[in-house]
Swiss-Prot record:
Organism of provenance: Aliivibrio fischeri (strain ATCC 700601 / ES114) (Vibrio fischeri)
Localization per record: Cell inner membrane
Molecular function via GO: ABC-type D-methionine transporter activity; ATP binding; ATP hydrolysis activity
UniProt keyword list: Amino-acid transport, ATP-binding, Cell inner membrane, Cell membrane, Membrane, Nucleotide-binding, Translocase, Transport
Name the record gives this protein: Methionine import ATP-binding protein MetN
Length: 344
């Protein structure tokens, strides 16, 4: 459905050349919810704007539904964009228009009849859960309701693709969850292809089938969400995943933590479990086999793409040789172990 082939985007600030996108290649299958995640300035918003030619790539191809948008004339591009809906972080609703009239605007511009507009807008508002808000103005809506109006408007031309540029960033957690559920529901009911740009791995974890990670304008890693969470290959992917299960070191431990081993100190370790290792009784195994004690400070577990993953902070009590053997045992059983320091 969406093919991004060797796309580069260069901006100029005076004589300075800024490579916002560097040789990006992505293939997004029809009906997929595809996430692109990256930190601020990574190039992800530039990428999504290239998909509907709001930003024209410096070079490369952007193929949507079999058509290379980079080769279209202005009139051809205008027509092709009807197949691509888009929602933003800021809802861009017209304050002087009611909910109904905001959703109706693209249909009016397309020259649809009043009867067709009435029918289509009524269907869309019912679809997004705003059947009772036809005559309400944006000023009287919550943030989540405003985004629902924006989604209905984006769907008014029956697009095959929906682009979401940080669509939940301005919303509180509960509202974010409801909007993500709506997007997932629309994907299921309409078989619409959805491209989501976000800086939150929580968004990717909750609704995406596949994900690409971008850093410094480059594609760092891509794959099924379950594969990325289970076997992250890059430091950036690991960083985003860890942020979804943020286990902070307690302050009293920070004050006693040393970088190197000293007599009488014990290692503080962070364990990362993915896939089958989450259910394996490896902690009790190393305690028995290597005659060590484990003090668990904190732990958390979650799901992404049908795969369980978890983090644990623990202090290990035992002699150095036994502790090192236990750590090697964990690593050999596909548990990632990081020694954060030594507690005195």
């Amino acid at each position: 459905m969406i093919e991004i082939n060797r796309v580069n985007k260069i901006f100029y600030q005076g004589a300075k050349e800024i490579n916002a996108l560097k040789d990006i290649n992505l293939h997004i299958a029809q009906g997929t919810i595809f996430g692109v995640i990256g930190s601020s300035g990574a190039g992800k918003s530039t990428l999504i704007r290239c998909v509907n030619m709001l930003e024209r790539p410096t070079n490369g191809e952007v193929v949507v539904d079999g058509v290379d948008l980079t080769k279209l004339s202005s009139s051809e591009l205008s027509k092709a964009r009807r197949n691509i809906g888009m929602i933003f972080q800021h809802f861009n609703l017209l304050a002087s228009r009611t909910v109904f009239d905001n959703v109706a605007l693209p249909l009016e511009l397309a020259g649809k009849s009043k009867h067709d507009i009435q029918k289509k807008v009524t269907e869309l508002l019912d679809l997004v859960g705003l059947a009772d808000k036809h005559h309400t103005y944006p000023a009287n809506l919550s943030g989540g309701q405003k985004q629902r109006v924006a989604i209905a408007r984006a769907l008014s031309t029956d697009p095959k693709v929906l682009l979401c540029d940080e669509a939940t960033s301005a919303l509180d957690p509960a509202t974010t969850k409801s909007i993500l559920e709506l997007i997932k529901d629309l994907n299921r009911k309409l078989s619409i292809t959805i491209l989501i740009i976000t800086h939150e791995m929580e968004v990717v974890k909750n609704i995406c089938h596949e994900v690409a990670i971008i850093g410094g304008g480059e594609l760092v890693e891509k794959g099924a969400v379950s594969d990325i969470f289970a076997h992250p290959k890059t430091a950036l992917a690991q960083e985003f995943i860890r942020a979804t299960l943020d286990l902070s070191i307690p302050e009293d431990f920070k004050a006693r933590l040393k970088d190197t081993y000293v007599e009488g100190s014990y290692p503080l370790i962070r364990l990362e479990f993915t896939g089958s290792t989450v259910d394996a009784p490896v902690i009790s195994q190393i305690s028995r086999e290597f005659d060590i004690d484990i003090s668990i400070l904190s732990s958390d577990i979650d799901y992404a793409g049908g795969v369980k993953f978890g983090l644990m902070l623990a202090e290990v009590f035992g002699n150095q040789e036994s502790t090192q053997k236990a750590i090697e045992f964990l690593r050999n059983h596909h548990v990632k172990v990081e020694v954060l320091g030594y507690v005195v």
